[in-house]
């Protein structure tokens, strides 16, 4: 997918990531862990799952990414959705979110979830804020071993793709 980034002359390409993107993805995620926006991911983990990511590329630079990981046959999670600080506010996150939703639809995944500090873009895309226990596959797989489990300040959001009418424009 190719888009025109808002408030810039750059052409933005959203594409599936490759192993060659892993280091750039890792560096982008790591720069946001320090700010408390994302959970830490190891380079090895990002390399192992690089093909589950979508990459936003502008001027041959990775400026955003997001991962779609299947938690069960019924639920997939959007993880590590992040845009480079200097590129925020240009619609890049919305384009990445659209690509991840489209991929979930293509894979016939009935439900998407995410845990986020910033629920607004998800809600604008049709997600609903829900209590954490409503996303039990995520809790069972990841949350119980997280050091923030008992004091998690992230919002749980879900999107029912069986009734979804369309990805954000």
Show the residue positions of the predicted features.
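Conserved acetyl-CoA-binding loop-helix of GNAT-fold acetyltransferases
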Residues: 89-102, 114
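Conserved glycine-rich acetyl-CoA-binding loop
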Residues: 61, 84-95, 107, 124
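Conserved beta-strand in the GNAT
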Residues: 55, 61-69, 74-82
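Conserved active-site alpha-helix within GNAT-family acetyltransferase domains
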Residues: 110, 116-142
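A short beta-loop-alpha structural element at the N-terminal edge
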Residues: 12-25
């Amino acid at each position: 997918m190719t888009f025109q980034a808002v408030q810039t002359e750059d052409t933005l390409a959203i594409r599936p990531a490759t192993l060659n993107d892993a280091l750039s993805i890792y560096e982008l995620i790591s720069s946001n862990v320090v700010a408390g926006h994302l959970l830490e991911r190891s380079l090895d983990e990002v390399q192992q799952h690089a093909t589950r990511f979508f990459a936003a590329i502008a001027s041959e630079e990775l400026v955003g990414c997001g991962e779609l990981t299947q938690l069960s046959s019924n639920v997939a999670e959007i993880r590590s959705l992040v845009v480079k600080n200097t590129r925020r506010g240009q619609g890049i996150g919305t384009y990445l979110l659209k690509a991840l939703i489209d991929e979930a639809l293509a894979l016939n995944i009935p439900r998407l979830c995410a845990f986020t500090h910033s629920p607004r873009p998800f809600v604008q895309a049709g997600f609903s804020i829900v209590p954490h226990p409503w996303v039990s596959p995520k809790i069972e797989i990841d949350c119980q071993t997280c050091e923030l489990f008992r004091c998690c300040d992230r919002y749980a959001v879900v999107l029912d793709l069986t009734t979804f009418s369309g990805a954000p424009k």
